[in-house]
């Protein structure tokens, strides 16, 4: 029976192998020359794509500014499809499914993505808020699976509730009532997000006006950031925080490629509504005082004037920081007004760094700078427990006999310096278990002092118990004390409270008496 020749048989010998060999030199150099992660966001993106076996898209994501994995998790259906189209993955639904699966794993179990990246210099990855950006992400997303007959769009779509749910759970700094509302950031500049100006929520003028030279001031305020337009204190950043944001933006901007006029023209031609809303900014002179206000108005990420934010919902510190960073970036490069994905990623990086530096500086402040009265009062309470004989001198020998407390709970709750000092003096010369007030660190925050306070009480309680056990045999022979018959469980906490000098165990004394009585009765019988 004659067989039909296979398609490879008609090719010249080695033709298929040579064709496959010609493809290899094109792929291997790109894999070898692939840029390694330089920031925390790029490292997270690298690990997610590595988990999904989609590292070929890594450079495309970086070139498009998609170095924020949380942005992919928070994206809605339309935004996610747009991102997939930007990186060239929209025509490959299987790749999209693999990416969705990796994103779900990253959101639910970030520990799976802790494998090291080869040849990554440790000093090149800024470790700002790693535990917060990589270790506490929790949320639920739809599985993205559909029947084979469904269109490709449904296969790579998240549930409609995923942006709202993840906005509450994946916010990098959940502080304040308005933390993490992803509805306000529209991803790329969509027509809905760049509608004409106006509306009820008009941005106010910045409190820190720019200098007459027209340059970007270092202390530029954030009054025009909040779209709520209240102009009050809650919608403004502190000048020190603004200074940190400006310094971080300038440091990142030194290595940031600036856009050109050709890019602006092409982007404005692609989006007519965007051109009508922000096109006039590119025609304004740099010395124009209104240019900064317009840039702040249209560079806002959270709380835009055309967003559907709940009335009365204030912006959190994290959102205000992102808005200020976005304004600073756009004032240095106006083309970022047209590339909101990249602008959002850069602003988040600045917000993480600035918040970390602010919290680090706050932890090093002295108690007087953090709110003197509460910390001083707490420090005084700790000092009273460390030196009770100085703060409260005993009036006489009666002070060495603290009043009897009937229960263990009351004794533990009212463990004061007076009762502790009385017990220690009754036992004998015992080394002090707590350092003097001069040894206490003065730069601890309130929660640190409370932790030290609780730790000292625990150590004093444990040391007191050990001191009683050690001194029991030592002082038992000197002054035996035979009080009423207390339960055995109350001995350790109540024996020294009942007698001036500790004595032998009451249960042992009573046991000896009962044994003698039993022997006497037995001998009589």
UniProtKB/Swiss-Prot annotation:
Acts as a transcriptional repressor for zinc finger transcription factors EGR1 and EGR2. Isoform 2 lacks repression ability. Residues 353-384 are annotated as: Necessary for nuclear localization. Residues 1-22, 135-237, 380-416, 502-525 are annotated as: Disordered. This is NGFI-A-binding protein 2. Induction: By serum and phorbol myristate acetate (PMA) stimulation. Its main location: nucleus. There is a cross-link at residue 517 (Glycyl lysine isopeptide (Lys-Gly) (interchain with G-Cter in SUMO2)). The keyword Transmembrane does not apply. The keyword Transport does not apply. Residues 267-356 are annotated as: NCD2. Homomultimers may associate with EGR1 bound to DNA. Belongs to the NAB family. Residues 35-113 are annotated as: NCD1. There is a cross-link at residues 379, 517 (Glycyl lysine isopeptide (Lys-Gly) (interchain with G-Cter in SUMO1)). GO terms for cellular component: nucleoplasm; nucleus. PANTHER family: NGFI-A BINDING PROTEIN, NGFI-A-BINDING PROTEIN 2. Widely expressed at low levels. Highly expressed in melanoma cell lines. Keywords: Isopeptide bond, Nucleus, Phosphoprotein, Repressor, Transcription, Transcription regulation, Ubl conjugation. The NAB conserved domain 1 (NCD1) interacts with EGR1 inhibitory domain and mediates multimerization.
């Amino acid at each position: 029976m004659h067989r039909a020749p296979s398609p490879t048989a008609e090719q010249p010998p080695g033709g298929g192998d040579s064709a496959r060999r010609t493809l290899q030199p094109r792929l291997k150099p790109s894999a070898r020359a692939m840029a390694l992660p330089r920031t925390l966001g790029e490292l997270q993106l690298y690990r997610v794509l590595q988990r999904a076996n989609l590292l070929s898209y890594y450079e495309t994501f970086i070139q498009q500014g998609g170095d924020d994995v949380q942005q992919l998790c928070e994206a809605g259906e339309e935004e996610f499809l747009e991102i997939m189209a930007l990186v060239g993955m929209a025509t490959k639904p299987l790749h999209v499914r693999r990416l969705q699966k990796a994103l779900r794993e990253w959101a639910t179990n970030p520990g799976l993505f802790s494998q090291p990246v080869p040849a990554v210099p440790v000093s090149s990855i800024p470790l700002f808020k790693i535990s917060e950006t990589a270790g506490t992400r929790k949320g639920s997303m739809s599985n993205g699976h559909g029947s084979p007959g469904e269109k490709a769009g449904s296969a790579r779509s998240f549930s409609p509730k995923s942006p709202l749910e993840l906005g509450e759970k994946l916010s990098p700094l959940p502080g304040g009532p308005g933390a993490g509302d992803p509805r306000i950031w529209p991803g790329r500049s969509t027509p809905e997000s760049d509608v004409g100006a106006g509306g009820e929520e008009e941005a106010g003028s910045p409190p820190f006006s720019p200098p007459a030279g027209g340059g970007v001031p270092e202390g530029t305020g954030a009054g025009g950031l909040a779209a709520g337009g209240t102009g009050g204190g809650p919608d403004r950043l502190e000048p020190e925080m603004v200074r940190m944001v400006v310094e971080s933006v300038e440091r990142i901007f030194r290595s940031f490629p600036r856009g050109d006029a050709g890019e602006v023209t092409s982007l404005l031609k692609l989006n007519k509504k965007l051109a009508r809303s922000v096109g006039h900014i590119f025609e304004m002179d740099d010395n124009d005082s209104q240019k900064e206000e317009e840039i702040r108005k249209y560079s806002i990420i959270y709380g835009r004037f055309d967003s559907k934010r709940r009335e009365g919902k204030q912006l959190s510190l994290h959102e205000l920081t992102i808005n200020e960073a976005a304004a600073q970036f756009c004032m240095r490069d106006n083309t970022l007004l047209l590339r909101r994905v990249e602008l959002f990623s850069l602003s988040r990086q600045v917000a993480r760094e600035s918040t970390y530096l602010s919290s680090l500086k706050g932890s090093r402040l002295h108690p007087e700078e953090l709110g003197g009265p509460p910390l001083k009062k707490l420090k005084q309470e700790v000092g009273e427990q460390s030196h009770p004989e100085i703060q409260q001198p005993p009036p006489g020998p009666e002070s060495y006999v603290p009043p009897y407390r009937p229960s263990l709970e009351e004794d533990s709750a009212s463990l004061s310096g007076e009762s502790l000092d009385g017990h220690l003096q009754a036992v004998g010369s015992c080394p002090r278990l707590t350092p003097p007030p001069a040894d206490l660190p003065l730069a601890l925050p309130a929660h640190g002092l409370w932790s030290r306070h609780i730790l000292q009480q625990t150590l004093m309680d444990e040391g007191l118990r050990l001191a009683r056990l050690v001194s029991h045999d030592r002082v038992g022979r000197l002054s035996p004390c035979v009080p009423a018959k207390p339960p055995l469980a109350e001995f350790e906490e109540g024996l020294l409270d009942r007698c001036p000098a500790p004595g032998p165990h009451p249960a042992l004394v009573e046991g000896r008496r009962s044994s003698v009585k039993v022997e006497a009765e037995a001998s009589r019988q």
